[in-house]
Amino acid sequence: MKKFERLIGEWHGEGEVSMEPPMKISVEAKIERLGEFIVISTVGEPAEMPDSVSIIGGAPDSEPQPMHYFDARGVKRLFMMTLEGSTWKIWRAPGEDWNGPHGPGFNQRFIGEISADGKTIDGRWERGTGDAGDQWGIDFPINYFRK
């Protein structure tokens, strides 16, 4: 979990969801250690960006870490997370809640690039479509700034 320590701190995120009209989003995120785990808590605006908490860890350090996500809507999801060099990746765990384009879930991933000085993360959430959920498009970009 040591490689994730560079994410620890308080962050402000800004992005925009492509819809009519476009929806600007704002997120306050706090990333901290809890023993051998990492906890991410977020407060989002507008209301469509639900407040959430995620608990990361439990796998050997050489493997992707499970990320258990819970939000104010009652949604719970299992993601996997890695940090390789400056690239932070989060993706839905294989088979987790994905039942094709008409199912209750959807395939989703985050890719973020951490700046050399560690003060910004240029990121985007992507959504998988198609019968296998493997045709990727940008769901929304979001950039984080260390407070």
Task: Map each language-model feature to its residues.
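A short, compositionally biased
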Residues: 9, 62-63, 118
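Edge beta-strand at a domain terminus
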Residues: 120, 124-147
